[in-house]
């Protein structure tokens, strides 16, 4: 891995974020930023995203998540920085 691929974050989003294309929105933004990881719906109605890559691009993704896609309502987006593990090759939507 390159020296810039050295950040990992977990992003938890609350609000009207399920049933509005939120995970597909995140997938598209993450792929545009060349980030790896996954996004998934949680049973409590939240969307969780775990992402690795360049910190600047993770911050770009976080800002996009705070805005959300049309039809969504983001009430809260929490980001937690973690040590990168390097165990993702692509970005995917987990069921």
UniProtKB/Swiss-Prot annotation:
Covalent S-S links between cysteines: none
Source species, domain of life: Bacteria
Entry-linked PROSITE patterns: ACYLPHOSPHATASE_1 (PS00150), ACYLPHOSPHATASE_3 (PS51160)
UniProt keyword annotation of Hydrolase present: yes
Keywords linked to the UniProt accession: Hydrolase
Record-listed E.C. numbers: 3.6.1.7
Active site per database record: 23, 41
A GO term, aspect molecular function: acylphosphatase activity
Catalytic activity: an acyl phosphate + H2O = a carboxylate + phosphate + H(+)
Domain Acylphosphatase-like residues, every copy: 8-95
Entry keyword Hydrolase: yes
EC top class, as a word: hydrolase
InterPro entries the record matches: Acylphosphatase (IPR020456), Acylphosphatase-like_dom (IPR001792), Acylphosphatase-like_dom_sf (IPR036046), Acylphosphatase_CS (IPR017968)
Similarity comment: Belongs to the acylphosphatase family.
This protein's name: Acylphosphatase
Annotated source species: Leptospira interrogans serogroup Icterohaemorrhagiae serovar Lai (strain 56601)
Recorded name of the encoding gene: acyP
